[in-house]
């Protein structure tokens, strides 16, 4: 067990069972959420307690296997080695409104999306809550930059690791921890409808970001296998339920793929499907993936598509490409390391 995956209430109960006074748990919790690498750094704890915790509950901080820093915009990409030798990626991005870290939720991915490097090799395992938290903490410590925003858009499908992701959100939002507001967190999903409904029940004030990437089943089936289980009509219906439960506008991710989903008819079909649903479209220049034959849309096609959506009443922005000189698209660094 890693103590960093426990809430303050759980940690208090655990240490009380071991005869420690109640205030000790808050001390330990605070140190853990500052990103200490050993209990020896917890200077306000008795030496005996530090030694015992070190023996019983090792902290297991991740190691930086590789780090790339963009010369263009300072975007920093990390390849972390976990305690079992598996590797995951996170990316620290600098914006005028603050620093955002994009984290992984799984080692590998089951979903098999055609345009994504993360899915090659399949799912190895799901991350523990502390392993997600560590990506935020140690990105912040290594860079010296305070993290104010988190996006769960790295390797893995967050809703496929539902319970651990919910615990991570609770921890990172904790006032005694990093205290990052839910409104500063975005969670991405390829469209696991039952889990979207579960998330809606929790009424969290985060941003749900749905990887849509197609206007209909015919196109989506060819690039996103998950669509065969949860067709686009079911997915949009779940998004409507989510909005009704949370009053939070849905963000739709849309990778612009030349000749696949970037036509005028595709834009018009999206407008019909989205009618009445408060939504924002994030148009994404497609990342190059070695094994994929898919090509990015031209700038002109992206601009035309954006205008069609906006003329139809949907807010659409073209995602700013960060770290293009370091190949900051997710999954690339891990794959190269595995080779």
State where each predicted segment sits.
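Auxiliary Fe-S-binding modules of radical SAM enzymes
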Residues: 1-88, 240-248, 254-339
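Glutamine-centric residue-chemistry signal
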Residues: 27, 106, 132-135, 306
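Short linear Ser/Thr-Pro motifs
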Residues: 70, 104-105, 118, 188, ...
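Helix-turn-helix/homeodomain-like alpha-helical modules used for DNA recognition
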Residues: 78-104
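Canonical Radical SAM [4Fe-4S] cluster-binding loop centered on the CxxxCxxC motif
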Residues: 94-131
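Conserved alpha-helical substructure of the radical SAM core
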Residues: 120-149
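Conserved AdoMet/S-adenosylmethionine-binding subsite of the radical SAM
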Residues: 140-149, 154-316
């Amino acid at each position: 067990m890693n103590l960093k995956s426990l809430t303050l209430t759980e940690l208090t109960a655990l240490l009380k069972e071991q005869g420690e006074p109640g205030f000790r748990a808050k001390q330990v919790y605070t140190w853990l959420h500052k990103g200490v690498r050993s209990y020896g750094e917890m200077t306000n704890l008795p030496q005996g307690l530090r030694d015992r915790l070190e023996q019983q509950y090792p902290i297991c901080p991740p190691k930086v296997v590789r780090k790339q820093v963009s010369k263009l915009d300072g975007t920093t990409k990390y390849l972390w080695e976990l305690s079992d030798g598996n590797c995951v990626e996170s990316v620290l991005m600098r914006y005028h409104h603050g620093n955002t870290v994009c984290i992984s939720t799984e080692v590998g991915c089951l979903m098999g999306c055609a345009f994504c490097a993360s899915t090659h090799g399949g799912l190895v395992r799901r991350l523990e809550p502390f392993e997600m938290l560590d990506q935020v903490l140690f990105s912040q410590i290594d860079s010296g930059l305070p993290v104010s925003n988190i996006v769960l858009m790295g390797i893995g499908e967050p809703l496929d690791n539902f319970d651990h992701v919910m615990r991570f959100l609770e921890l990172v939002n904790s006032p005694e921890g990093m205290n990052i507001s839910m409104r500063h967190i975005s969670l991405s999903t390829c469209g696991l409808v039952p889990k979207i409904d579960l998330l809606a029940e929790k009424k969290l004030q985060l941003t749900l970001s749905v990887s849509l990437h197609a206007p209909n089943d015919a196109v989506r089936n060819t690039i996103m296998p998950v669509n065969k289980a949860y067709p686009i009509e079911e997915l949009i219906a779940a998004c409507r339920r989510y909005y009704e439960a949370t009053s939070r506008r849905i963000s739709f991710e849309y990778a612009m793929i030349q000749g696949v989903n970037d036509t005028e008819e595709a834009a018009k079909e999206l407008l019909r499907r989205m009618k009445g649903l408060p939504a924002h479209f994030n148009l994404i220049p497609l990342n190059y993936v070695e094994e994929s034959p898919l090509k990015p849309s031209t700038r002109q096609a992206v601009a035309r598509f954006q205008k069609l959506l906006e003329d139809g009443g949907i807010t659409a922005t073209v995602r700013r490409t960060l770290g293009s000189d370091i190949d900051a698209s997710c999954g690339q660094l891990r794959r190269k390391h595995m080779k």
